[in-house]
């Protein structure tokens, strides 16, 4: 079977611990046997980030801007315990945060729905996609500890010297406290809005945008005004043509409505809100192991995909001891497929897109049709006996068998069409 040619490169960002183990298996068994692809490889393991003073994370981000598509393995964000474990030079920032700040764009998280797998929220029949603004707010904030009595002020001085703002924020008592200053930019918010509206059009789904503008009357209301103005100027007629809607909601109201709904919509959220709610949605649909995460810029030209979960440290410890593991690799497989499909769309190569879709179907059918699954999914079905689940590698092998049969069948169909 000849390999499918991928015209332009894909940036590959390797990661840490158990996800690094399954990453290698996916690449060797599901990707490279079928694709002739130039992978621009960057090792984002915690050891390599420490060795390069985190330069490798920045380099991989700029490579993504250059080539347009990246696929990322889960990585460790170090805390004090990890600093000691790996003897790190410093507590390096989250790689995802660094990547998001360089690329900009919006992070969209979407559940992978397998009908056989029960949902914690049973009436969520359709996907709920969470769009998370990938810039600013708490994630670029400056925070300080206040250790004595004094005044906290907020100052702004314009570059032209014509405007100076000096506001008293709070007068601290002797016991001190904490303070934080955070920001966002109109350009970034507009890009966030554009990416959200574009995805709603592409998926033909209603879009909700959430803030707490009743409390943050300048900060959050600026988000709302930018969204509303862009919608009225550029998207209102397009939405009406598709019979979909856009609506701003207070976040507390939206979360309550989301829990009562059947799904089938997109929620655009500010950075922190999206971070929290995407995990809630993932759990409601079953598992973080069944959640995709993509970052896309407003112009659609820069794209990065990854699994929404972490590095699965507990399983990695078992792997290190030579013990059997049963780690769910579905979200990591979908990280690869979403990057492959995007690459195919940008390159206008239908066979690359078709391969990505076939690999997704092979993965889902392995569970839904074949009944082969990892331990976490078996437990969700109430099955606890050892025969009800397969190991980490066995699951990927089952997907590989199903994919091979689908690829052979697809090639036979092509030959039949040629004879006709």
From Swiss-Prot:
GO-annotated molecular function: isocitrate dehydrogenase (NADP+) activity; magnesium ion binding; NAD binding
EC number(s) stated in the UniProt entry for this protein: 1.1.1.42
Source species of the chain: Saccharomyces cerevisiae (strain ATCC 204508 / S288c) (Baker's yeast)
Required cofactor names: Mg(2+); Mn(2+)
GO cellular component: cytoplasm; mitochondrion; peroxisome
Residues of the site described as Critical for catalysis: 139, 212
Protein name, UniProt field: Isocitrate dehydrogenase [NADP]
S-S bridge residues: none
Comment on bound cofactor: Binds 1 Mg(2+) or Mn(2+) ion per subunit.
PROSITE patterns: IDH_IMDH
Taxonomy, superkingdom: Eukaryota
Pfam families associated with the record: Iso_dh
Catalytic activity as recorded in UniProt: D-threo-isocitrate + NADP(+) = 2-oxoglutarate + CO2 + NADPH
């Amino acid at each position: 079977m000849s390999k499918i040619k991928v015209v332009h490169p894909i940036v590959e960002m390797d990661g840490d611990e158990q996800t690094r183990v399954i990453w290698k298996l996916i690449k060797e068994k599901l990707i490279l046997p079928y694709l002739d692809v130039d992978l621009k490889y960057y090792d984002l393991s915690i050891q390599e980030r420490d060795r390069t003073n985190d330069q490798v994370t920045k380099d991989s981000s700029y490579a993504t801007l250059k080539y347009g598509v990246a696929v990322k393995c889960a990585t460790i964000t170090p805390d004090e315990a990890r600093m000691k474990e790996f003897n790190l030079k410093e507590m390096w920032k989250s790689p995802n945060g660094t990547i998001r700040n360089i690329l900009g764009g919006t992070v969209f998280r979407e559940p992978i729905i397998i009908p056989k797998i029960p949902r914690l929220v049973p009436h969520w029949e359709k996907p709920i996609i969470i769009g998370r603004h990938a810039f600013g707010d708490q994630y670029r904030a400056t925070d300080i500890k206040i250790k004595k009595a004094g005044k906290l002020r907020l100052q702004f001085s314009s570059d032209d010297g014509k405007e100076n703002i000096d506001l008293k924020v709070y007068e601290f008592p002797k016991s001190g406290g904490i303070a934080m200053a955070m920001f966002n930019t109109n350009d970034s918010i507009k890009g966030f809005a554009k990416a959200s509206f574009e995805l709603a059009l592409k998926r033909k789904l209603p879009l909700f945008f959430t803030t707490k503008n009743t409390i943050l009357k300048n900060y959050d209301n600026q988000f709302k005004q930018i969204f509303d103005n862009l919608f009225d100027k550029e998207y209102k007629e397009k939405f009406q043509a598709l019979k979909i809607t856009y609506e701003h909601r207070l976040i507390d109201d939206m979360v309550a409505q989301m829990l009562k709904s059947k799904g089938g919509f997109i929620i655009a959220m500010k950075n922190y809100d999206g971070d929290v709610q995407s995990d809630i949605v993932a759990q409601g649909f079953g598992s973080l192991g069944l959640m995709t995460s993509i970052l896309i810029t407003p112009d659609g030209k820069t794209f990065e995909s990854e699994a929404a979960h972490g590095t699965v440290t507990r399983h990695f410890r078992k792997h290190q001891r030579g013990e059997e593991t049963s780690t769910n690799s579905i979200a990591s497989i979908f990280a690869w497929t979403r990057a492959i499909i995007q690459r195919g769309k940008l390159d206008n190569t239908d066979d690359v897109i078709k391969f990505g879709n076939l690999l997704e179907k092979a993965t889902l059918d392995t569970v839904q049709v074949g009944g082969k699954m990892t331990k976490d999914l078996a437990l969700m079905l109430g099955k606890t006996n050892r025969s009800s689940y397969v190991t980490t590698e066995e699951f990927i092998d089952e997907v590989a068998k199903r994919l091979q049969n689908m690829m052979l069948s697809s090639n036979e169909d092509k030959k039949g069409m040629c004879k006709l």
